[in-house]
Structure formats: structure tokens, C-alpha cells
């Protein structure tokens, strides 16, 4: 079963994405801040990461977490999500290896 790590500071968003993926037989883990995200990334070694770019309760933002993940394992696909996206953010995310 494929493992997906979902990172967002909003529990409801994490739960919604998790339930949709579980219905499709994915194994999901949730992180609500950057410390949790990095710890779970190392622990579960996900096959895919869904990462919110703006984490209000974190030391690191989504781009910084993306860079950290890519330094650990550059082969894991990372999808950046945001409710407040811009073209600059999209370009920055792609340049750092996100989808």
C-alpha cells in the first residue's frame, strides 16, 4: 500500500484529504507543523507528500520543508497546495522540485 504524508496546519483539510486517499486504498499520515512533518517524513518514508505552503504554527514554511525533504530524498514526489497561491510561489515551488 502506498504511503502519503499530508502536511497542513488545518486539521480539517488534512482529514478531508486523508479520507479521500484512504477510500482509494492509500495509507496516510498527517502532520500539522514543520517539526512533525520532518519527523514523520524520516520515520515513514512516504511515497508521496502533499504539502501546504503556508503553515501558521511552524518554524519553517512549506518551501523550506520542501528543500529539507529534497535534501533527505530527492526522489519522493511532493505536491504543493495553497489557498493563497501566486505565480511567484508556483515558480519557486517548481524550481525547488515540487509538482
Predicted features, each with a name:
Residues 2, 45-47, 71-77:
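His-Asp phosphorelay/catalytic-motif detector in bacterial-type signaling
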Residues 7-8, 31, 49:
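Conserved sequence signature across two-component system core domains
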Residues 11-29:
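Two-component/phosphorelay signaling modules centered on CheY-like receiver
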Residues 25-34, 40:
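Short hydrophobic/Thr-rich beta-strand motif most characteristic of the beta2 strand and flanking loop
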Residues 39, 54, 61-75, 92:
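Short amphipathic alpha-helix used as the core "switch/output" element in two-component signaling
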Residues 44-50, 55:
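Active-site beta3 strand of CheY-like receiver
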Amino acid at each position: 500500500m502506498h504511503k502519503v504524508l499530508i502536511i497542513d496546519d488545518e486539521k480539517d483539510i488534512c482529514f478531508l484529504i486523508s479520507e479521500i486517499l484512504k477510500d482509494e486504498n492509500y495509507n496516510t499520515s498527517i502532520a500539522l507543523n514543520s517539526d512533525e512533518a520532518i519527523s514523520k517524513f524520516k520515520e515513514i518514508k512516504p511515497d508521496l507528500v502533499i504539502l501546504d505552503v503556508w503553515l501558521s504554527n511552524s518554524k519553517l514554511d512549506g518551501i523550506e520543508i520542501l528543500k529539507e525533504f529534497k535534501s533527505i530524498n530527492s526522489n519522493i514526489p511532493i505536491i504543493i497546495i495553497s489557498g493563497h497561491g501566486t505565480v511567484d510561489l508556483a515558480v519557486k515551488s517548481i524550481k525547488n522540485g515540487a509538482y
